[in-house]
């Protein structure tokens, strides 16, 4: 129902036993969303050869991932090799996925390469969108509607105000799936939105669904491998094997403090 919001912190499609792959191919963006950690990162792209090497590494370590998500803290379609990367993913037998802001004009280029995609849209109000740092709302809506006639589209909405319900109604009327995502509670996100700090009590014992179920591997712009896409302050990242060891003794890594996805 349109008045019932699906709340989720996941940004990936469902996965199988082999972990999916998410690659931060760019930190550049044509939006300036106040909640985005990427706006304070160095603005740059991942080299195509580096991406191809990471894909080969993942294949050798884990096998063919069910999904390779081309996204991080930037707008993926700004990368000049975005569709080339998607083609490479298909060539190895996987399925490319992305979450785009929907401003790319040549929407038809997605059809032969993608089985499904995500589009971010937080509000239907141009005024509210501008306050958030989002633009070209009519173009985004047109992008969603046109592409939804060719493939499943999921609209991702950050839970900021009542605008999420208006987006839910808009999606419901068009038969489009929507996922509403809360703001992250981690310090490496929170500094950008102190007025919206999520209120929740975190358990002392540490458990992480990404580590338990081996859901995915996230590769940031520098090629660093992590178990999820929520670790932005990599100085505190102890490494994948150390995180698994810490989980076994219910010890929370510093890089996971405040994370909504951990117990």
Predicted regions, residues:
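Radical SAM enzyme [4Fe-4S]-AdoMet core and its adjacent flexible, acidic
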Residues: 13, 24, 39, 44-49, ...
């Amino acid at each position: 129902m349109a008045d019932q919001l699906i709340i989720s912190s996941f940004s990936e499609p469902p996965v199988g036993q082999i972990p999916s792959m998410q690659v931060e191919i760019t930190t550049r963006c044509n939006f300036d969303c106040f909640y985005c950690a990427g706006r304070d990162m160095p603005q740059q792209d991942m080299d195509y050869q580096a991406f191809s090497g990471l894909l080969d590494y993942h294949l050798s370590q884990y096998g063919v991932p069910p999904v390779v998500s081309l996204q991080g803290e930037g707008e993926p379609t700004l990368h000049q090799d975005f569709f080339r990367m998607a083609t490479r993913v298909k060539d190895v037998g996987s399925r490319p996925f992305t979450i785009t802001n929907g401003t790319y004009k040549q929407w038809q280029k997605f059809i032969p390469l993608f089985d499904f995609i995500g589009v971010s849209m937080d509000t239907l109000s141009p005024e509210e969108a501008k306050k958030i740092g989002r633009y070209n709302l009519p173009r985004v809506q047109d992008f969603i509607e046109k592409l939804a006639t060719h493939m499943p589209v999921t609209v991702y909405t950050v839970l900021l105000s009542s605008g999420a319900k208006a987006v839910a109604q808009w999606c419901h009327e068009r038969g489009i799936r929507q996922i509403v995502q809360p703001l992250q509670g981690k310090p490496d996100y929170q500094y950008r939105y102190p007025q919206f700090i999520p209120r929740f009590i975190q358990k002392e014992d540490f458990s992480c669904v990404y580590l338990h179920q081996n859901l995915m591997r996230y590769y940031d712009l520098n090629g660093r491998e992590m178990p999820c896409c929520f670790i932005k302050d990599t100085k505190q990242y102890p490494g994948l094997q150390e995180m698994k060891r810490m989980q076994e003794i219910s010890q929370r890594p510093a890089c996971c403090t405040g994370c909504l996805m951990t117990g």
